[in-house]
Amino acid sequence: MVEYEAPLRDYEFLFNEVFDVTPTMERLGYDFDEDFLSMLAEGWADHAKEVWLPINQIGDRVGLNFENGEITMPQEFKDAYNQAIEGGWLSTSTKPEHGGMGTPIFFQSVIWGEIATSTNMAMSVLPALTLGVYDVLNEHGDQTLIDYFSTHLAQGHWAGTMCLTEPHAGTDLGIISSKAIPQDDGTYRVTGTKIFITYGEHDMTENIVHLVLAKTPGSPEGTKGITMFLVPKYLPVDLESGDLAGASHDLMENHNGVTCAGSEEKMGIHASPTCVMNFDNSVGWRVGDLHTGMKLMFQMMNQERLATGIMGLGLAEIAYQNSLAWAKDRRQGRDLKGPKDPNETADNILVHPDVRRMLLESKVNNEGCRALAAWTGILLDQMHSDDPEEAEYASSLVALFTPIVKAHFTDVACETASTCMQVMGGAGYCTEYGVEQFYRDVRISKIWEGTNGVQALDLAGRKITQNMGKNLRHLMWPLTEFIEENRNIPEMSEFNKPLHQGVRGLQQLTLLMIAEGQANPHFLAAGATDYCRYFGNVLLAYMWAKIAKTASKKKGDPFYDAKIASARFFFKRIFPETVSLAAKIQSGHKSVMEFPTEMF
């Protein structure tokens, strides 16, 4: 039986104590306080545990059914999804005028996202994608589209997807062949095939709204010629009047030429459809200006990249909780220094140093990533500040953090899920205990929304030099300020000194990557993944130093003492990885690129 308890105490600690979020949210205009956050988080945690978690293994074992171009989801999934709609749990951060709660973005992106993924990753993807479509539409769509589609999307009655990839065009979207032909009434006729479309077809909602990248006649070559179009599965228009808001008949009678040609068989997330979608002269509406499709889609994609990082964290957390429960219950052997439970036939396996190491690595990485997720979530809200300086500062940090959250979180999550299987031995490999499903499900997170190698290239090749290096300078301000503030505090020395060394190392490696990368792009590309990992570790080091500083004010309380001990483990056993990462980056590209191709 899979166990799960949402880390509600950790959320309270991070948002209320480490980051003291209430004054920021009040300044941004939210009707918000600590009690409201706790009530909302507890309510969602209870719902997800009671409704979503029990059907997670059903989704894995039963999966979906694809027949005659239609996908039928497990009935349990449809029932659970509708319960979430009724409870308002799919519309927490959407606008009140569209039926949403209007909560701060950080609740939906961090707290909702982690709990949803822990309890049912396959289910969680659908509302995450729908929210992305809703946000892009409300920022860039014309008012007619916003007025008609937003409420349906915000409340979860209609679902959303993003359609980028084609059989011949994956990372290189500039060569897509999907076409959009303008019509006299202002609509477009969209034709093309898209692949790997998550939730492209299903029966969970009344309608599916696709954001499709396509090219219009005479468009420039490459990505500069791409435009975004909104293409619904069913046309919500009155066919006689052509009035978008005048639909008065059954949507099922008004199919829009959007069909599913296949559903991929996958390693994990079996109840999350991955579709081949055909658009055959389908009616669509342009979103944004002509030839701005890539810019608009990257807004949604960056949102989904952050969501994917949180998904990794969610699965790593539930994997850790279940392996910890197993370790406490499983008795094998004795402590090397003598029995801990002499009245039992054996000690539980938590006495063994290697088991403790594995569990501590899992716990500490999870909690460090959660702290960085919390900071990033708050920045997402600050991006919408009326203060231009605050908005610019937040935007630059979110741009910098996005590839790190996506890549570092999911790299670590896959390692954690594998480690948690190892803690459980043979039981971890068996389907009965659930952890092997978490590993299969989380593995896609390193591939989704741009592989982690692409994220590393984005960080090293673009984000650190973007805006004349402003992104990185904005990060260095709080880091160097924290280091200076704690330089002469003895109890912070064990955390502050290695953090300082890590930050200095990051600065030096960044200069090296820029200088050598300009001379030879192979240098930058060969070191990008290690640089991203190094950067991620430095950010987690900053989080753990802040956590230790906050917890030191309440020593003697087991919760806070555990935070300090966890910070100590991070700096002693995880952060030293940066030394080897730096050595690999500094070694350059020659051992990679000069290896003869014919010898592979």
Language model features with spans:
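Internal maturation/activation junctions in enzymes
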Residues: 64, 77, 111, 126-130, ...
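Alpha-helix capping/hinge segments and adjacent helical runs
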Residues: 2-5, 182, 189, 269, ...
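A glycine-rich, basic-preceded beta-loop-alpha segment at the flavin cofactor/substrate interface
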Residues: 196-198, 237-261, 266, 273-304, ...
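A structural-propensity feature for long, helix-poor, extended segments
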Residues: 132-133, 142-145, 149, 449-451, ...
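A short core secondary-structure module
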Residues: 187, 191-252
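Glycine-rich cofactor-pocket loops
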Residues: 25, 29-32, 61-73, 293-307, ...
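Amphipathic, small/basic residue-rich leader segments at the start of a protein or domain
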Residues: 1-123, 148, 381, 590-600
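C-terminal amphipathic alpha-helical interaction region
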Residues: 466, 482-600
